[in-house]
Amino acid sequence: MQNITQSWFVQGMIKATTDAWLKGWDERNGGNLTLRLDDADIAPYKDNVHAQPRYIPLSQPMPLLANTPFIVTGSGKFFRNVQLDPAANLGVVKVDSDGAGYHILWGLTNEAVPTSELPAHFLSHCERIKATNGKDRVIMHCHATNLIALTYVLENDTAVFTRQLWEGSTECLVVFPDGVGILPWMVPGTDEIGQATAQEMQKHSLVLWPFHGVFGSGSTLDETFGLIDTAEKSAQVLVKVYSMGGMKQTISREELIALGKRFGVTPLASALAL
């Protein structure tokens, strides 16, 4: 019998959550991570499935995700503990045939449940599936320190925030040419913040929750982690620059245009126009 804890997706979640903890992005039970799987991914581990999988209804139906398996982090779970006990802190779930709820197939032991941000994740998965023709499979939420700090001092506007991050590090325009969406402050763990995040995910692979954290989407765990890491590195540079009196020189609009042409990406027009 194959052990699901040795699967690529459980091992990938262990690495991503451990790396995020070591970065300081996920204190206590902060942050959540979901990865969309295929039936073929979980098929070799049918002997690991709970004898009587628990069923949990969704707060709103999501037919686009019908019959889709995911691996998710648990509610109230600490990222730092995932590596110690994957089955207690992670779960494999599968949405039912009409998208009205899901069964917990593996993990989330002792009656644990998926992250409270699951509605936001699932709504964002729906939008990224449509926006990327199914390429994006990961939604990651974390409390990236410097990105949060910038939401207190920069205008919380997509164009302004995006342009500052592009100028903070040359690679940023190449990594997220679609810019960074920004919400107003909202209560977390609600359908409302999930819907607002998903709306921004139609246009952006990164979405900031001011004074709280960031949502990122990507095709793999590495790509998604790297996306957030790149934006956070630029934010760290900007925090240092602002603390030293601000920019005396920076990357110009013309240089940003040249950068986009060189790497074959189309920069967000509103950010480029500033």
UniProtKB/Swiss-Prot annotation:
SMART domains according to UniProt: Aldolase_II (SM01007)
One GO term of the biological process aspect: rhamnose catabolic process
Catalytic residues in the record: 117
Main location: cytoplasm
Entry's Gene Ontology cellular component terms: cytosol
Compartments, record wording: Cytoplasm
Family per similarity comment: Belongs to the aldolase class II family. RhaD subfamily.
Function as written in the Swiss-Prot or TrEMBL entry: Catalyzes the reversible cleavage of L-rhamnulose-1-phosphate to dihydroxyacetone phosphate (DHAP) and L-lactaldehyde.
Protein name as it appears in the record: Rhamnulose-1-phosphate aldolase
